[in-house]
Amino acid sequence: DAGTVYGDSIIGTLGIYDSRQYDGTFADGSSRAANHDLCDHVLSSICNDIRTLYEPKWTRRGMWDSRYFEAWSPRVPAMLLELLSHENFADMRYGLDPRFHFTVGRSVYKGILKFLSDQYGYDYVVQPLPVEHFAAVLNDKRQVELSWQPVDDPLEPTAKAEKYIVYKRVGNGSFDNGTVVKKTRCVMDVPADEVVSFKIAALNQGGESFPSEILSVGIASASTAKPVLVVNGFDRTGAPDDFRSNDDEQAGVLADDDNGVPYKQMISYVGKMKEFRRAIPWTDDDAAGYGDSYGNYEKLVIKGNTFDYPALHGQSILKAGYSFVSVSKAALADHAYMNADLYSAVDIILGKEKQSKMGRIGAVKGFDFKSFDQTMQQAITDYCKAGGRVFVSGSYVATDIFQNPLVKAEDADKKFAREILKYEWRDDKAACEGAIKTVASPLTEERADYSYYNKPNEESYVVESPDAIVPADPAAYTCFRYSENNLPAGV
């Protein structure tokens, strides 16, 4: 309850410690002045990292030597951390973003680590960041070849990967305990007619990184056809869409437009924001004022981006009689994976990928998670011109190119959509009831109904406002429509 202010002002981070209780000593007789040092390390780590990566105007509110129970009662080094004001719009634009969560959690860890290093005179090593540019393909011996790249931490020179753990999962089972390797490439045997999945973690003396996305392969033993390449293009996590009125009197998050993408799952979501007037004060918990939300999701753990979609698509590909491999979107910059001589088709998973901001526009970061970046556009163009076949699925395949409210549309992007993928934007927020149907077309004469997740749930990320798209070529045709209004859902 640190308060709310207008504009883009950040209330920021406060640390609280106690140095005077128990005659100023811990149980072992050492000075409680160490609490000050711990607090300073953690606050410095948080504020430096946030200012460098996201928001140069992030406020360090200071440190209080105060008799808060949680600060004075422990007889070991302790501090209280008030990271931000959950009432303040400018703070919470960052506070709702999973990337911010990761950075701050890592900052706290680094602050504690450096405090212990100072206390005991040891050198420290920070655990590595997750690897990127992951790819899982099959070689001529029908073995899987895994490759990836380490990621250096610009904020911490000790956080370099020394080794890696390769985790494997067969079918719908659990991941094994992992195999340690020293290089950024690994070859393994895989059983046929099973979806086999992998994830990578980096290792050093400081510990183990967060895992990579999950990529999968499958060998259809009876198939003589070329395999299908699956591109895992959905790597977005982020806060909900937000707005601020021109007069600054209203601001908040737009759950019906895009409620954000949690990292794997979210336990803290209670419901949509319903009070946007910034002047409305808190009265009591039944009239919570600005930022008040519904409570209909208090008991639900909301699913976000699991980073595990090639396995899901691969099950269907394998069932259809094709082998498949998968690569990350970033890996397309390293190798010409989209090769019509090697793959019978390419399945591009985009999910809720779209150009998104972090907090205040113009702070440090630009826009991340473009659905079709230049590398992908070129790879798809070359593949299609060589006779390749492409299947693309995603909520914002047109809006991100034609009508993203954050970014000016580029003529080259629109030309790519129209001339290579043969579709055009018709509408955003095209449907809300979660149902589509097939229509008579060269694809199929069969009538079928399908559903998608249109509300927060425990099974899948939610699709709040999918696109309507129309053919942009005389040879193209509509094959799906939204059941509620007949707007075109697929081309």
Annotate the PLM regions.
Residues 162-166:
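Short beta-strand elements bearing conserved aromatic residues within extracellular beta-rich modules
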Residues 176-183:
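Short beta-strand segments within Ig-like beta-sandwich modules, predominantly Fibronectin type-III
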Residues 3-6, 54-121:
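Active-site-adjacent mobile loop/cap segments within catalytic or ligand-binding domains
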Residues 353-465, 471-477, 483-484:
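A glycine-rich, often tryptophan-bearing local segment used as a flexible ligand/cofactor-contacting loop or short
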Residues 266-409:
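Helical hinge/lid and interdomain linker segments adjacent to catalytic or ligand-binding clefts
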Residues 3-31, 360-365:
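A short, glycine/acidic-enriched catalytic loop
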Residues 115-158, 206-225:
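Pro/Thr/Ser/Gly-rich low-complexity, intrinsically disordered linker/stalk tracts
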Residues 187-208:
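Beta-strand-rich modules
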